[in-house]
C-alpha cells in the first residue's frame, strides 16, 4: 500500500519472487508540470494545505504515483552516524544499523537513485548563501541529489514533478522499468486492512466511488507518516503510539533585498547546506 520511498522499493524487490500489487489513492503524475494551480490540486495531499492542529505548521505531502519522491526537492542526505547509533540503542538491534549489511542496503539505494553532486545546478540564491557562510566561517557543501541530468533545471517547476524525466523518483526507478513484475492500481484509496486471527486477509479499497474487498496474502503498509497511522486506526489497531511522535523539519522563509535579480525558483531547489550546527 503506497508507491513512495518505502512502498516502491519493497514492491520491486518482492516482485522478483512473488505476485505483487501496488495500491495508491493517487494518480500518475502528469508530465505537463508547469502549472502551479494544477500541481497543488493534483500532486499534494489536501492541495498542499495539510497542517497541524491550529494550522501552526503547514505540511507539504506528496500525492501521486511515486509519493513524495515525485515532487520533493531531491535533497538526498545519508542518515548521520549519531542517528544510526540512537536507532541501535533504542531498538536493541545489536549494531544492525551500523552493520555491513545495512550499509550495503544504503549503497544499493544510492546507486539506483543516482545520488551525487554532479547534477546540482547551483542557483544564484545558493551562491549568496555560500557567500554568507564564507563571511561567517561556516562550513558547507553541495547537496547530493537524485537526478540523472541538469536538463530542465531552468523550468522553475521542480516542486510539481519533472516534465524532463531528470528526477529519479520512486516510480521511475523501482516501478516503471521492466524489472518490476507487478501491477499498479492508481486512484485506489485504502479504507482499511481486514484482520482475522491476527493476520491480514483482505484490504478494503475505494475506486470511483465503489468499495470492494481484495484478498491478500501479505500486506506492506507504506502510506507515509500521515496516512499510515490513519489506515491502521481505521483497521482497528489500538496501539496508543499510533499517530504520536511525528518529527518534522520546520522551514522558515527568509526574505532579503539584493542588487541582482534572484529568481529563486530556477535551478536546484536546494543547492548548499551546512552541518556545522548538527547535534549541538
Each predicted region: which residue ranges?
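N-terminal glycine-rich phosphate/pyrophosphate-binding loop and immediately adjacent elements
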Residues: 1-87, 94, 99-100, 238-257, ...
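Short, hydrophobic alpha-helix immediately C-terminal to the catalytic nucleophile
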Residues: 8-12, 172, 229, 233
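Short, well-ordered alpha-helix to beta-strand connector turns
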Residues: 17-18, 181, 216-217
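Hydrophobic anchor at the start of a short beta-strand
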Residues: 18-20, 140, 219
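Glycine-rich loop(s) and the adjacent beta-strand/alpha-helix scaffold that form part
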Residues: 26-31, 36, 64, 188, ...
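Short, hydrophobic/aliphatic alpha-helical segments
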Residues: 45-60, 210-216, 270-277
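Conserved redox-cofactor binding core of oxidoreductases
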Residues: 90-190
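Flavin (FAD/FMN)-binding glycine-rich loop and adjacent Rossmann-like elements that form
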Residues: 161-168, 260-280
